[in-house]
């Protein structure tokens, strides 16, 4: 009863087409049957909706179980060059050599994401840990001004990129650098209008 009622309410408010539904975070082969069960339960109720999951196992997309994969940047090699029309990415905690916005990471590793989004024609970025002010699994709340590692359960900065303020979110220096990366993405798209995508990528 809940899902059809939710869909009807979203349509009534005019936001259904902009809504994205989610089944499970990072499903892998050991939970394939359970994921299929959930997928087959929800799909008939939301037949015209879009589904997105954080997904690093390409086989789930290959089997038509996920419309929009949001892939961990460290796992993108399995998706690049495949027929994925709406590829999103995200990053979480540190992996050597990939874009990341942890406190201990140099800014270039944060900003470089913008160029990568352009080069691989990524359609969106899923913010993992945008404003997570809890310990792992949300057992306790934390003050991000005093504890930057989710109570020593994550790498510092992996769990948030904005701070809570009296009148809304306050951008961290990492969020500002991330914005610069998005400006790089916009610059690449503008360059493409003048010289074409192939030449823009060659210049990169």
Regions found by a protein language model. Give the residues of each.
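Catalytic domains of carbohydrate-active enzymes that cleave complex glycans
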Residues: 1-32, 41-56, 138-204
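Catalytic-core regions of glycoside hydrolase
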Residues: 1-138
């Amino acid at each position: 009863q809940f899902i059809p009622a939710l869909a009807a309410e979203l349509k009534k408010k005019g936001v259904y087409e902009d809504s994205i539904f989610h089944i499970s975070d990072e499903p892998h082969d050991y939970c394939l049957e359970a994921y299929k069960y959930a997928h087959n339960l929800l799909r008939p109720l939301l037949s015209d909706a879009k589904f997105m999951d954080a997904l690093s196992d390409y086989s789930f997309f290959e089997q038509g179980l996920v419309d929009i994969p949001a892939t961990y940047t460290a796992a993108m090699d399995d998706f690049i060059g495949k027929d994925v029309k709406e590829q999103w990415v995200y990053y979480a905690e540190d992996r050597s050599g990939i874009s990341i916005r942890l406190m201990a990471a140099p800014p270039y590793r944060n900003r470089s994401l913008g160029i990568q989004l352009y080069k691989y024609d990524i359609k969106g970025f899923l913010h993992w840990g945008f404003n997570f002010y809890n310990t792992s699994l949300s057992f306790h709340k934390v003050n991000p001004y005093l504890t930057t590692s989710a109570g020593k359960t994550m790498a510092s900065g992996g769990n948030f990129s904005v701070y809570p303020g009296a009148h809304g979110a306050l951008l961290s220096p990492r969020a500002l650098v991330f914005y610069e990366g998005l400006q790089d993405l916009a610059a690449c798209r503008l360059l493409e209008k003048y010289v074409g995508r192939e030449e823009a990528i060659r210049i990169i």
